[in-house]
Design a protein with these regions (language model features):
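Glycine-rich oxoanion-binding loops at beta->alpha junctions
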Residues: 131-140
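A glycine- and small-residue-enriched flexible loop/hinge signal that marks low-structured segments
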Residues: 2-54, 81, 101-104, 115-116, ...
Length: 293
């Protein structure tokens, strides 16, 4: 308590320095240096006078302590916000917030959030005998589309990047086929993201090279993908890519002290392009009452 309070800049700190000044004599019993400590003030001031030769030395030491505290806070916050799990959480909430803010300009649009992980979604769709018996159909189809007075969903976004990895519990491309059935049954298009390495390329430059795209997607590795695209109900599933930047790197960000995000090469926070697609859909619906263009 004493260290933190002595290291603070402000009214109490200035009075502490005044009481240490030789011009004020040795009467230090009324010093308010440590709030609520009563007679302990004299002991504190005595120890400070014994340790520091001048007010300038004390002030310099206090400033160094404050800088050390700020460096420690910077390091701790960077450790938190650079963690993969925290970035996923932050990106999800920032993306959702951008949709809610866009909705503010469209009073006839409702945004509903279902707290369901991708793993729970996979289990729900893969373990049910038919789509109409799944939890998702109950929430999206039966309770809204198939209920008198219900409010059918116009579009559903899943904040998950589709992957072709074989290390997952379920084949994600097969789960995507089940999502196509769900979208068709509920008459609700579904938007997802695609992983950065889904098409074997990590940069966005190749998207405009049609010959390269045709060569990649026509290879044997993407036979399952081609079968998915050939399904009649595949029109109910869309992938939005690449990822989009939600915020830049924090530089001299004022949060009570100046916070700088490291490493310096950090490009900030990136999230699913599905949120951008949803905002565009809301804007189009607000413009003409239809989101099919």
């Amino acid at each position: 308590r004493r260290v933190v309070y002595v290291g603070a800049y402000g009214y109490e700190n200035s009075r502490l320095m005044q009481n240490m000044s030789p011009s004020l004599g040795n009467n230090m019993s009324s010093s308010p240096a440590v709030y609520g400590m009563g007679g302990g003030d004299t002991e504190v001031l005595g120890r400070l006078k014994a340790r520091f030769q001048s007010l300038a030395q004390l002030s310099s030491t206090m400033r160094m302590l404050v800088l050390d505290i700020e460096d420690s806070l910077n390091a701790q916050i960077n450790t938190i916000i650079e963690h993969e799990k925290f970035q996923t959480l932050e990106a999800r909430w920032m993306g959702l917030a951008s949709v809610v803010w866009a909705k503010d300009y469209a009073s006839n649009v409702k945004v509903k959030v279902l707290d369901l992980s991708w793993q729970e979604l996979e289990h729900d769709l893969n373990y049910t005998s038919e789509i109409r018996k799944s939890l998702l159909f109950l929430r999206i189809g039966m309770q809204e589309l198939d209920t008198l007075g219900g409010e059918p969903f116009g579009i559903l976004m899943i904040d998950h990047e589709l992957s072709m990895s074989l290390e997952t519990d379920f084949d994600e491309l097969y789960t995507a086929q089940l999502l196509c059935r769900l979208g068709e049954t509920c008459m609700c298009p579904i938007i997802m993201g695609a992983g950065t390495a889904f098409f074997g390329e990590s940069d966005a430059a190749w998207y405009t090279d049609t010959r390269r795209v045709t060569s990649v997607l026509g290879s044997g590795e993407y036979a399952t993908w081609q079968r998915l695209r050939a399904l009649p109900n595949a029109q109910y599933l869309g992938l939005a890519m690449p990822r989009t930047q939600l915020r830049g790197r924090y530089i001299d960000h004022d949060i009570g002290f100046l916070f700088n995000q490291t490493p310096a090469v950090s490009e900030g926070l990136w999230g699913s392009a599905g949120f951008d697609f949803i905002r565009t859909t809301i804007s189009e619906y607000q413009r003409c009452g239809w989101c099919g263009f």
